[in-house]
Structures are given as structure tokens and as C-alpha cells.
Design a protein with these regions (language model features):
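N-terminal entry/capping and adjacent linker segments that precede and initiate structured domains
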Residues: 1-199
Length: 199
């Protein structure tokens, strides 16, 4: 009897692995053999798995930047407690801006936190995106003045993190800044891939 083609076996294994519901189950399966690990760590497989099994809500980041973990009887409570113990929600690993103004949390998405530092009535802000668990950060360059000041100076700029797209790398991110002018609204987009702002 001929052996099945390797790609067919891989496809069957993928379908089996897609039925595993937790990251812990995937991690255990990936340690069984190199073939399982190769299949499970493939980006397209992980994307499909995340679509079928969205990550659990582990907690909330409060306005002051502190983390409120999920509590029992929530099934995510042990993982949430572990996250609270391991991550740095004081953001001490992010350098203080040159202005000396402390960081404030503006948005949280996909495990990343968008921080900003600005004085009252200041529209152009210092911004950073960080991962409190891995303690990595990216300081965003300022929005170029030639982009921000079109016909007039913006009244306010509201930054938000964009959700990760299906075709995007898990390490990349985008920040959207909505600039509010007297008579119009303009969106500026920062991409971690290009490290630049665009309209």
C-alpha cells in the first residue's frame, strides 16, 4: 500500500490541531515531534487557529495604566494572575519623554499598549507603543509638521491602535491619529513596518 503524500498528512494534522482550543494544548502538541512543531508554528496555521479560537479576556487596563486581572470563577483567572505578575504595567521600561511629562495609557489592543505624553492644550504628542509582558517598546516619531499643519493647526489629535489584520505579521502594528481641524477630520497612520507616518 502506498504511503500518503506528506502534504496530505500535514493538512490532516492541521485540521486536528485546529480543534485544540487553548494555547497550552497547542504548546504541548508542538513538543511531540519536529513535524508537529513546524505545522503549529506556521503563521498561516496560527492565523486560522486565532480566528477559530479568539484569545480569552485576561483583564482590563485601567485609565491610570494599572491592570485588573480576571478573577475566579472565570476560567482565565490563573492565566490572568500569571500575566499580572509577569508584566510591567508601570511601563518603567519605556524611557521618559524629553518633556519629562509622564506616560498615560490611550489605547490597548492585541497585547500592546499605546502611551502618550502631552501637556494640556498641546496637540502634537510624544507617543510609544509597548508590550508590557515582553517589555519591548517603539517610540513613535512625531507626525511631520508638513503633514499635520495643512491649512490650519489641528484642534486635537486622537491616537488609537489599529487591530492586526489577517495578512499582517503579529509583531507589526499601526497607530491611527485622527486630527480634528475646524472644518475637517484627517487620519494619519503610522506603520511599524515602514516606521513612517502617512495620510
Amino acid at each position: 500500500m502506498p504511503t500518503p503524500a506528506p502534504h496530505l498528512v500535514d493538512e490532516i494534522l492541521e485540521e486536528i490541531f485546529l480543534r485544540l482550543t487553548t494555547p497550552a494544548e497547542l504548546a504541548r502538541a508542538s513538543t511531540a515531534c519536529p513535524r508537529f512543531r513546524r505545522i503549529i508554528t506556521d503563521r498561516s496555521f496560527l492565523r486560522r487557529h486565532r480566528k477559530l479560537h479568539p484569545p480569552p479576556l485576561l483583564g482590563l487596563v485601567n485609565v491610570d495604566g494599572s491592570f485588573q486581572p480576571a478573577e475566579a470563577p472565570d476560567p482565565s483567572a490563573p492565566l490572568a494572575r500569571a500575566l499580572a505578575d509577569a508584566a510591567d504595567f508601570t511601563y518603567s521600561f519605556v524611557p521618559v519623554p524629553s518633556s519629562g511629562i509622564p506616560w498615560h495609557v490611550r489605547d490597548v489592543r492585541d497585547g500592546r499598549v499605546l502611551l502618550e505624553a502631552c501637556q494640556v492644550l498641546e496637540t502634537l504628542k510624544d507617543m510609544a507603543v509597548c508590550d508590557p509582558l515582553s517589555r519591548r517598546y517603539v517610540l513613535l516619531p512625531p507626525i511631520p509638521t508638513d503633514l499635520a499643519v495643512q491649512e490650519e493647526y489641528p484642534f486635537d489629535i486622537v491616537p488609537i491602535l489599529a487591530p492586526i489584520g489577517d495578512d499582517e505579521d503579529d509583531m507589526s502594528f499601526k497607530v491611527i491619529c485622527l486630527a480634528i481641524y475646524g472644518s475637517k477630520l484627517t487620519a494619519f497612520i503610522f506603520s511599524s513596518v515602514t516606521q513612517q507616518w502617512c495620510i
